[in-house]
A protein has these predicted regions:
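Active-site beta-loop-alpha junctions enriched in small/polar residues
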Residues: 66-68, 95-96, 121-125, 139, ...
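Divalent metal-coordination and catalytic microenvironments
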Residues: 11, 27, 32, 53, ...
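C-terminal cap of metal-dependent C-N hydrolases
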Residues: 351-403
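Histidine-rich, glycine-flanked metal-binding segment
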Residues: 1-57
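His/Asp/Glu-enriched, well-ordered alpha-helical/loop segment
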Residues: 277-360
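Metal-associated gating/positioning segment near the N- to mid-region
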Residues: 42-43, 51-111
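Metal-cofactor-binding active-site regions of metalloenzymes
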Residues: 73, 85-91, 95-96, 111-144, ...
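Histidine/acidic residue-rich metal-binding segments in metalloenzymes
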Residues: 103, 147-265, 273-290
Length: 422
């Protein structure tokens, strides 16, 4: 029998790229790559792990985190807060801009066991200290001089192994009370198009409309001006410019059109950007996320986000099929990042990034970003994680909800136009 480095036996495999949904199989790893997947593999292994009763999936991909630790107020430690909670690939979304990216590369990307990728902020300083990131008034796009398109393009071209797209925040509070939003958005669109990479847009309480007025085809909108492969993050927030028409309770027409065009709707839960009510309305209309992501950062790791699997748990509670939940955190983001030949599946030859998950019963009140609670009856928790075939420790699971965080979040409910009592 052939010898391999690792074999994971008897797991329930969910691998959407290969259309495997619940088969009891073994997974073999050799030389840091997936060697084979099948029933009763005839191999001997240096290390053997029994995954009976557990889900075995490709290594989870968190498509939206902030992990520029110490250099930005939001920066988490990716190995502690992502890898140790079952995530093998984390995408830092906009913490760094062209002027600050090399620090992210040298001190985070190159030193982390977690695979860290990047969406480069259109603002040269990224989220070094701006608006909600730094606790000071104003934001990173208040001054258009900071949005150096040429510098952004040059940084992307020189670092394509790490930089997979562009990021912009469209919110009046970080764009000179809305005065610079249109131009900032146009620059971000132009840079991403010139570099042939996707654009991720944070779109909350913005002067750029979600739904353009009838006949206003020339008015720039979001997501109306996004293209196939672009990311619309924070898709389920309940503030002004939510995806829901507050008059008729339907998902906006421009949002539906964007999905048909190939725009990817990303959860980006965050400290303030996931609303149970918005998600429930969307779910009833079949508007599920393409990608489930956490927007994990220093202000939400102890609630209301906790980790990616907790966000996945919320969509399982909403009725999203488990297979689709796994797909939205594996092959869909891998394809969107142009990395589906390396990560996102258990295909032979791909990097041996593997997450083993327990789906367990619970009876817990789980909060959204604005203090609304739902009674969750099942949860997903990480059991084992392997990055390039190497096993890493899992941190203990956390308790929900965090009452201190609930008190801190209370003010955000007042800003919502969609909420439980409206």
């Amino acid at each position: 029998m052939e010898q391999v480095d690792l074999v994971i036996r008897n797991g329930t495999i969910i691998d959407p790229k290969n259309e495997i949904n619940g088969a009891i199989c073994d997974v073999a790893v050799k030389n840091s790559k997936i060697h084979s997947v099948g029933k009763g593999l005839l191999v001997t292994a240096v290390k053997e792990t029994d995954a009976a009763g557990c889900l075995v999936t490709p290594g989870l991909i968190d498509n939206h985190v902030h992990c520029y630790e110490y250099a930005t107020p939001l920066g988490i430690n990716p190995d502690r807060d992502c890898l140790a909670r079952g995530v093998t690939t984390a995408v830092d979304c906009g913490s760094a801009g062209a002027s600050t990216f090399m620090g992210l590369r040298k001190y985070i990307v190159e030193k982390s066991k977690t695979r860290v990728l990047c969406l480069l902020h259109i603002a040269s300083h990224g989220l070094a200290a701006a608006g909600c990131a730094g606790g000071c008034p104003g934001g990173e796009s208040d001054t258009l001089a900071f949005l150096d398109s040429d510098a952004c393009k040059g940084c992307i071209e020189n670092n394509r192994d790490v930089i997979k797209g562009v990021k912009i925040r469209l919110q009046k509070s970080v764009c000179a009370k809305g005065a610079t939003e249109d131009e900032a958005y146009r620059r971000a669109l132009a840079v991403s198009e010139a570099c042939a990479v996707p654009l991720m847009v944070h779109h909350i309480e913005s002067s750029v409309p979600t739904q353009r007025p009838d006949g206003a085809d020339t008015r720039i909108g979001c997501p109306s001006h996004l293209r196939a492969g672009d990311f619309y993050t924070h898709a389920y927030h309940g503030y002004d410019e939510t995806i829901i028409n507050s008059t008729n309770g339907k998902v906006h027409d421009d949002v539906i059109s964007a999905r048909k065009r190939g725009v990817l709707f990303d959860v980006g839960h965050g400290m303030g950007s996931f609303n149970w009510k918005v998600a429930e309305i969307s779910a009833k209309q079949g508007f599920w996320p393409d990608i489930i992501s956490s927007d994990l950062h220093t202000q939400n790791i102890h609630g209301p986000v906790y980790d990616l699997l907790t966000v996945m748990t919320k969509f399982l509670h909403l009725g999203m099929p488990l297979y689709e939940v796994i797909k939205s955190t594996t092959i869909t983001p891998a394809r969107a990042l142009g990395m589906d030949t390396e990560i996102g599946s258990l295909t032979a030859g791909c990097d041996a990034d593997i997450t083993i998950i327990k789906q367990e019963a619970c009876d817990i009140q789980l909060e959204d970003s604005v203090t609304q609670l739902r009674n969750v009856k099942q949860r997903l928790v990480p059991v084992h994680v392997f990055r390039a075939g190497v096993q890493h420790s899992i941190l203990p699971k956390v308790l929900w909800p965090n009452e201190d965080i609930l008190q801190h979040l209370a003010f955000q409910l007042e800003r919502c136009v969609i909420k439980d009592d409206v």
